[in-house]
């Protein structure tokens, strides 16, 4: 699933293609998954922002003054395999027809992606978006608050994946951050030192992943690529994710893979020992 670095890279790549353009029509094949998109017809794209793993297209009437705020948001969630392309393909689910005559295609082989038009800030229909925590690279994500929350957390990796303590961290970047912080993925109730290490690791890993355009894990049709076919580069910096059985880059112990919270989870059993409460 595309996580924050992949979605942020997508935003940066497609914003120049859409900003200032009018959406003439949105054509799709599943009204239950792509909801209220007709509300975007005839509206101009003012800009694109991102919240966690969600893209938000800011739309306004085509004749609205430049200083008028946008009055509609088109929320795009890439799901497991969604992404934008410049050419239609067998997995195209949504077509954005622009007033310029150009088209942008949303491809999604596994059909978990969503496109929903809402009033600005009206995220009641998307509870994960409405309740998610601060952006990991923003000033709103503070070490003091994170340490306080982590002191009473359950198993730390599922806690991160809930999006409540911090937004945009998924399977890949949770595993990588926990390796950098030397924390077992099932560790509970982090002490201040552990939580501080994890806080700093999240910021460092996410910044590096954004800088390298995210992670591309293969060449299959569902693997992450940008609209121009370019992949990410952070997969070459993975220390644990996808490396089960390979030696840890820090100590040489084979990386293990377990299932935790129904998610495949990679860690080093030596560098990331599970602490007992007695050793807190």
Swiss-Prot record:
Pfam family, one: zf-FPG_IleRS
Keyword Zinc: yes
Gene3D superfamilies: 1.10.8.50, MutM-like, N-terminal
Cofactor: Zn(2+)
Keyword Iron (UniProt): no
Entry GO MF terms: 8-oxo-7,8-dihydroguanine DNA N-glycosylase activity; class I DNA-(apurinic or apyrimidinic site) endonuclease activity; damaged DNA binding; DNA-(apurinic or apyrimidinic site) endonuclease activity; zinc ion binding
First and last residues of each zinc finger (FPG-type): 239-273
EC number: 3.2.2.23, 4.2.99.18
UniProt binding sites for DNA: 91, 110, 152
Cofactor note: Binds 1 zinc ion per subunit.
GO biological process, alphabetically ordered: base-excision repair
InterPro entries assigned to the protein according to its UniProt record, in alphabetical order: DNA_glyclase/AP_lyase_DNA-bd (IPR015886), DNA_glyclase_Znf_dom_DNA_BS (IPR015887), Formamido-pyr_DNA_Glyclase (IPR020629), FPG_cat (IPR012319), MutM-like_N-ter (IPR035937), Ribosomal_uS13-like_H2TH (IPR010979), Znf_DNA_glyclase/AP_lyase (IPR000214), Znf_FPG/IleRS (IPR010663)
Keywords, comma-separated and alphabetical: DNA damage, DNA repair, DNA-binding, Glycosidase, Hydrolase, Lyase, Metal-binding, Multifunctional enzyme, Zinc, Zinc-finger
Reaction equations catalysed: Hydrolysis of DNA containing ring-opened 7-methylguanine residues, releasing 2,6-diamino-4-hydroxy-5-(N-methyl)formamidopyrimidine; 2'-deoxyribonucleotide-(2'-deoxyribose 5'-phosphate)-2'-deoxyribonucleotide-DNA = a 3'-end 2'-deoxyribonucleotide-(2,3-dehydro-2,3-deoxyribose 5'-phosphate)-DNA + a 5'-end 5'-phospho-2'-deoxyribonucleoside-DNA + H(+)
List of catalytic residues: 2 (schiff-base intermediate with dna), 3 (proton donor), 53 (proton donor), 263 (proton donor)
Cystine crosslinks: none
Matches recorded under HAMAP family: Fapy_DNA_glycosyl (MF_00103)
PANTHER family assigned to the protein according to its UniProt record, in alphabetical order: FORMAMIDOPYRIMIDINE-DNA GLYCOSYLASE (PTHR22993:SF9)
NCBIfam families, A to Z: fpg, PRK01103.1, PRK14811.1
Family: Belongs to the FPG family.
Assembly with partners or alone: Monomer.
Function according to Swiss-Prot or TrEMBL: Involved in base excision repair of DNA damaged by oxidation or by mutagenic agents. Acts as a DNA glycosylase that recognizes and removes damaged bases. Has a preference for oxidized purines, such as 7,8-dihydro-8-oxoguanine (8-oxoG). Has AP (apurinic/apyrimidinic) lyase activity and introduces nicks in the DNA strand. Cleaves the DNA backbone by beta-delta elimination to generate a single-strand break at the site of the removed base with both 3'- and 5'-phosphates.
Official protein name in the record: Formamidopyrimidine-DNA glycosylase
